[in-house]
C-alpha cells in the first residue's frame, strides 16, 4: 500500500498493477529519447520531460518529486542560517548510513540504494559501481515481496556521465534494458516499470568559474561565518561538488550589488535574489528583470517585468502569450500558461522555477543569492577538481540540466511533468 498524507491510498496489485519504480541518477531526457530511437526499451510508452527544480541537484529534485522533507542545504556542505556558519561536508560519506546522514525523508521510501561509501566512489570508479549496483538490485528485487511496490535508486549513471561522458552511459542503458527485459519476462504484465531521473546533465568541456577570486577583487571577504554587521562585505559560499550553480550568503543590503558585480565574471549567466514579498530580481550580463507572483482564489499567475534587456530570453514567449490573449491588464498570465509555453525553453518553466527556488522550502537554509552558471562551467571544491576530470555536470537552470525524464511500461504520460506534480505519477 502506498500513502502520502492526504493522498489516496492504493494497494499494489488490487487497484493498480504492482510498480517497480527505478530512479536513474542524472540521466537526461535527450539520451533516453535517443536510446529509444536505437531500439532500447521496446514496447515502452514514450518518455516525457520531467522538469527538475533549480538548483538541479538530487536531494532537491527528489524531495520535490516525492513531496518529502527538504534537505538542510543544497549539498552536504551547507550554510546554516541559524548559526550563520558553514557546516557539514565529507563526513556524510563516512561510516554507516545513520538517520543523521539522511538528507530527506524520500530515502525512507527506498527499497534499494547503494552502500553509503559508493556515493563517493561512484565518482572515482563509476563502471565498477554500476556493475555492482545492477547485481545487488537484481538480487534484492527478485527476493522482495511480490505484492507491494519496489523503489530503487541507482547512482552509477550519474558518475558515468560526470567522469566518463555520454558513450559509457549509452552502454549502461543497454545493460539496463537487458535486465529490465528479464524482469518483465519474470513479472509479466502484473508489474508496471516506471523509469525516471532526478535531473539532466550538461555534457561537454567543463571549466571552472573563479568565483572566490573575482569576489575578492571586488572587495568582498570570503568567510565561513557571517557576523551580521551592517555594511559588512563578508560572503559565505560553500564549495563542494563540481556543479553548475553557486549559493551565496551575505548581509541583506549587499544582495543587489553582489549580483551586479557577478555580471562581469566569465561563466556567470545570471543571479537571482528576493527583493519583495512577491517578487525576485534576475540580474545577468544580458540585463535585469523581475519575476512577480500573484495568487487569487487559489489560482497562481506570474508576470515577467523586463527592467533592462531580457536575461531569461522570454520576449518571444511573452509576445505569444499576449497574442493569444493570455496576459491580463497587469501583464500576468497563469502559471499553467507559462509552463505550457516554456516547458522546452532554454530555461524550462523559468518563472515558477526561479521564483520558487527562493520562496519555497527547496532546502531549509535558502541562499540570499543563487548564481546560475552557463553551460560548460562549474563551481566547487578545489580538492575534488584535482581528483576528477569532468565530462559533464548539472546544477544550473538551463534545459540540459533541468530536463529529466519519466517513462512507463503501462501508461502514456503527459507531454511534460513539473517536479512538484510528479508524485501522483510515481507513487500514488
Q: Where would I find each of the regions flagged by the language model?
A:
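Metal-dependent active-site segment of extracytoplasmic phospho-/sulfohydrolases and closely related
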Residues: 20-23, 176-211, 370
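Acidic, His- and aromatic-enriched active-site or binding-groove loops in soluble protein domains
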Residues: 42-47, 72-79, 171-181, 211-230
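Active-site neighborhoods of enzymes that stabilize oxyanions during catalysis
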Residues: 234-425
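A short acidic (Asp/Glu
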Residues: 31-35, 161-166, 203-209, 382-383
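Active-site-proximal N-terminal segment of extracellular/periplasmic enzymes that hydrolyze or transfer
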Residues: 2-49
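Short, solvent-exposed loop/turn segments at secondary-structure junctions
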Residues: 26-29, 72, 155-159, 200-202, ...
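His/Asp/Glu-rich, glycine-adjacent segments
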Residues: 4, 36-39, 53-175, 234-239, ...
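A short, conserved beta-to-alpha structural element at the edge of catalytic cores
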Residues: 8, 47-62, 220-236
Amino acid at each position: 500500500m502506498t500513502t502520502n498524507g492526504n493522498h489516496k491510498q492504493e494497494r499494489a496489485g488490487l487497484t493498480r498493477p504492482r510498480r517497480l519504480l527505478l530512479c536513474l541518477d542524472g540521466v537526461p531526457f535527450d539520451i533516453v529519447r535517443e536510446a529509444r530511437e536505437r531500439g532500447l526499451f521496446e514496447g515502452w510508452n514514450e518518455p516525457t520531460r520531467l522538469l527538475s527544480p533549480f538548483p538541479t541537484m538530487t536531494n532537491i529534485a527528489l524531495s520535490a518529486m516525492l513531496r518529502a522533507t527538504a534537505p538542510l542545504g543544497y549539498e552536504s556542505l551547507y550554510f546554516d542560517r541559524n548559526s550563520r556558519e558553514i557546516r557539514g561536508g565529507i563526513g556524510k560519506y563516512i561510516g554507516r548510513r545513520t538517520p543523521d546522514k539522511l538528507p530527506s525523508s524520500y530515502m525512507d521510501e527506498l527499497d534499494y540504494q547503494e552502500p553509503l561509501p559508493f556515493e563517493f566512489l561512484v565518482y572515482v570508479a563509476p563502471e565498477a559501481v554500476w556493475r555492482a549496483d545492477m547485481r545487488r538490485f537484481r538480487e534484492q528485487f527478485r527476493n522482495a515481496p511480490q505484492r507491494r511496490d519496489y523503489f530503487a535508486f541507482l547512482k552509477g549513471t550519474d558518475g558515468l556521465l560526470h567522469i566518463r561522458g555520454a558513450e559509457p552511459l549509452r552502454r549502461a542503458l543497454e545493460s539496463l534494458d537487458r535486465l529490465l527485459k528479464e524482469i518483465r519476462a519474470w513479472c509479466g504484465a502484473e508489474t508496471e516499470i516506471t523509469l525516471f531521473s532526478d535531473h539532466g546533465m550538461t555534457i561537454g568541456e567543463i571549466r571552472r568559474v573563479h568565483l572566490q577570486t573575482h569576489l575578492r577583487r571586488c572587495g568582498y571577504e570570503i568567510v565561513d561565518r557571517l557576523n551580521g554587521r551592517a555594511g559588512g562585505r563578508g560572503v559565505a559560499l560553500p564549495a563542494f561538488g563540481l556543479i553548475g550553480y553557486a549559493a551565496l550568503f551575505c548581509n541583506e543590503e549587499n544582495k543587489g550589488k553582489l549580483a551586479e558585480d557577478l555580471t562581469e565574471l566569465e561563466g556567470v549567466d545570471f543571479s537571482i535574489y528576493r527583493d519583495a514579498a512577491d517578487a525576485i530580481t534576475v540580474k545577468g550580463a544580458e540585463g535585469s528583470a523581475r519575476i512577480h507572483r500573484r495568487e487569487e482564489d487559489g489560482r497562481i499567475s506570474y508576470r515577467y517585468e523586463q527592467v533592462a534587456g531580457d536575461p531569461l530570453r522570454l520576449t518571444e514567449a511573452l509576445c505569444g502569450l499576449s497574442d493569444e490573449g493570455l496576459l491580463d491588464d497587469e501583464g500576468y498570465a497563469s502559471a499553467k500558461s507559462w509552463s505550457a509555453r516554456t516547458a522546452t525553453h532554454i530555461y524550462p518553466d523559468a518563472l515558477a522555477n526561479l521564483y520558487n527556488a527562493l520562496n519555497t522550502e527547496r532546502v531549509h537554509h535558502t541562499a540570499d543569492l543563487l548564481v546560475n552558471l552557463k553551460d560548460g562551467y562549474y563551481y566547487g571544491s578545489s580538492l575534488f577538481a584535482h581528483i576528477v576530470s569532468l565530462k559533464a555536470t548539472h546544477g544550473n537552470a538551463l534545459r540540459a540540466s533541468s530536463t529529466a525524464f519519466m517513462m512507463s511500461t503501462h501508461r502514456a504520460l503527459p507531454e511534460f511533468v513539473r517536479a512538484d506534480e510528479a508524485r501522483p505519477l510515481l507513487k500514488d
